[in-house]
């Protein structure tokens, strides 16, 4: 087989032990203790000094001198100057995301569990939400849409965005335009752990939020986990999102160029990104065409350096059959799963663990990343085995009610008295007895 400048290491599944398979599917290891020691002092500084600390961090990290670290709505039109074409593109994406997330709203449910006993579940929007929009290696208005639109659909009364400024001290106008469109009340000019702390604890003029959303690097993720575990913050987070990742399953019917670019589109996100390709019964010629396409496209792309670094932690595995491919995929639990398979949709029932799935030759990850309507804020680092991606539900909380009639408590009361006494909780039992229930 030819050698290429950029080549993903490849293996045959049949030649691997269970331990070797585990090693190949391992994510890049992060030194969490070291990250925490960096993040915690920043969080404490923001708690104690508020906006002044954000101004100092902007000077330190972005090399920008800010007079204020907050933009308040209504936002000046000059801050939202974007081309008509980009405005139209954002509006199309907004509408698709809005349509899909609106369909997720659920009516109040009411169930009579037995005669005289009615239980309900109703939703309420989270009052104050904070949306973190990264800005390190790329401007990400798409993330502003993915977080802002479901917040609007859910009806969250107070929305705050936090995003780092550009080199000139301004926020990308696309993000300001989206902030205005979703009804955000403020934009905090900060990135990293300091942004998470500002939203979790509040700063002058911007009260603390109840829940924080948004992807980010290892420092952002560590900060989110820290504030979630701080009872003084009383703040929830969406999910522990880490580096971008994709797993592609491809058979002989695939287009090598499409496979290569689906892989590279995630590799270009960051140095810690990871890509995995599982090939099913590929001929040597088709396998080489994919490797060549990866090399050729990677060398010409603007973020070639990042891709080269990410590929060092990536792998191609030649599996024996489709069932084995899905066994590997479910073990890995990818953020993005792409199916370059004949009759791809027929394999959806085999998927147990994945953030979002891209089915067939016409469904690149890019569509979900920007505008198909699904959400691109997804669980990574294996959390797809226990977490879902961001949805409208993420911005809602559910409250249950129960209402009993006199007949209902007489029917159900004896059961509750006996169960309460079994647990030794006599006040529970007496709260039923005092209402006239007797065994």
UniProtKB/Swiss-Prot annotation:
Pathway(s) per entry: Amino-acid biosynthesis; L-histidine biosynthesis; L-histidine from 5-phospho-alpha-D-ribose 1-diphosphate: step 9/9
Record EC number: 1.1.1.23
Protein name per Swiss-Prot or TrEMBL: Histidinol dehydrogenase
What organism is the protein native to? Schizosaccharomyces pombe (strain 972 / ATCC 24843) (Fission yeast)
Any GO BP: L-histidine biosynthetic process
Q: Which of this chain's residues are annotated to bind Zn(2+)? A: 266, 269, 369, 428
Q: Which UniProt keywords apply?
A: Amino-acid biosynthesis, Histidine biosynthesis, Metal-binding, NAD, Oxidoreductase, Zinc
Gene behind this protein: his2
Q: What GO molecular function annotations does the UniProt record carry, in alphabetical order?
A: histidinol dehydrogenase activity; metal ion binding; NAD binding
Reported cofactor(s): Zn(2+)
Q: Please name the HAMAP family in this protein's record.
A: HisD
Under InterPro entries, the record lists: Ald_DH/histidinol_DH, Histidinol_DH_CS, Histidinol_DH_monofunct, Hstdl_DH
